[in-house]
Amino acid sequence: EAIKLEPDFIEAHSNLGITLQALIRLEEAIIIYKDAIIINSYYPEVHYNLGNTLKELGQLEEAGISYKHAIALKHNYYEAYSNLGITLQDLGRLEEAEINYKQALTIDPDYATAHNNLGLALQELGRLEEAETSYKHAIRLNPNSPDALMNLSIVQDYLNNLDIAIIQLKNLLIIDPDNYGLRAAVIIAIYSFLENDFSTSKKYLLQSSKIENYLTLNFKNERIYHQYLLKILDWHENKPFPLLNKISDRKLYVIGESHALVSHGLHVKFLDKSFLCKSMLIQGCMQWHLGNSIKNKFKVKFENIIKSISNQSDVLLSIGEIDCRLDNGIIKHRKKFPKKNMMHLITNTIENYLNYVYKINSYYKHKIIIQGVPSPNIETKNISKHKILELINLIRDFNIILKNKSTELGFGFLDIYKITNRGDGFSNEIWHLDNIHLSPQGMLEAWKNYSSY
């Protein structure tokens, strides 16, 4: 109504844009903000709000331009600096993001959100101690910030300070029980499982059962772990004998992403020796992360774990399945760069990963076994034949090259693909626990076929 009476009333345009944005009518909000800028391009808040709306729509480059316009008009606009930092971080421009977060904090050192966001950028850059400091600043300014508490727990995990991580997670159970607390409960369940406290693990999984109803992206990771770990625990509960009592067995450290969890607590035998598997988790770790020349959080945790175990230990590395998914890793990268050769991408990923492991292990002399990637166990109904063939060929070739390169470097190779392949590259559905992971029984079966380092 105000706009009808006075079409050049910029505050009315701005307020209408904010209202439309709150109603998730983002395209309409953008039109209104742009109309306002035509009326008066010197109104920094309109540029800022336009940037926020564009960011919500994923139009990151355009959002960045709007934030820069806002900052040019209002040099002390610390919120715009912080949001520009978020946009740059989402674009993968982490060093630029860091600069903008720090500029926001120069203007307002008590801006807790910028401390938290700076921590996220530093974490992705592999500067974990600095990230820890930033999160602690954010928590000091806002002790009940679930974002900062969760992020601090995550960085403590990558630093391998699991006891400290658990303290932050337990705080989240109290502060935000129906949101971040659900995610925290799942993570505590994982830690409890890895400490062989299966009953406590089950308790926290049951406590967080509502997470199955949370379908947003923020909960996806913990929701998958919730389902997966429940199935692992059910398998252990249904075994007729306790698997964790043979303390005389030599330890086999299983280091990796979610696929490492299923081995924990299993007794395996190879080369006439018995081993008790102890899993050590690096959530979301890909071969690409470790083979990358740039320092990152995954490398920091991997190296912390490798250093934490006795020299010349037996180690199984369970990393690589995430590199071989339809929506991630090599296929996702090739979609972005379609001219790149698939075999070159596979070989490059594997060689960089294995060379990194070989170099890091040169001092510790661990006896390394590389775990292969299972045949895919996916629903193909809504996937094109081209995509299915691409995935099948990728996983087949990935395993062949991974095995050959592992052998060249003197590593053992645990062939998961062989026992899961029904003959055409798809899973035989015998050894999978879910659509992604093998069952504990599947891992035991794989070890029956293992012959040497």
Q: What are these model-predicted stretches?
A:
Residues 9, 43, 77, 111, ...:
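Residue-level recognition of tetratricopeptide repeat
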Residues 11-22, 45-56, 79-90, 113-124, ...:
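Conserved alpha-helical positions within TPR/SEL1-like repeat arrays
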Residues 252-352:
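Conserved SGNH/GDSL esterase-like catalytic core that processes O-acyl groups on lipids
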Residues 320-323, 357-392:
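Active-site segments of SGNH/GDSL-like serine hydrolases
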Residues 366-374, 396-430, 449-453:
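Extracellular serine-dependent O-acyl
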Residues 378-416, 436, 441:
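Substrate-gating cap/lid alpha-helix
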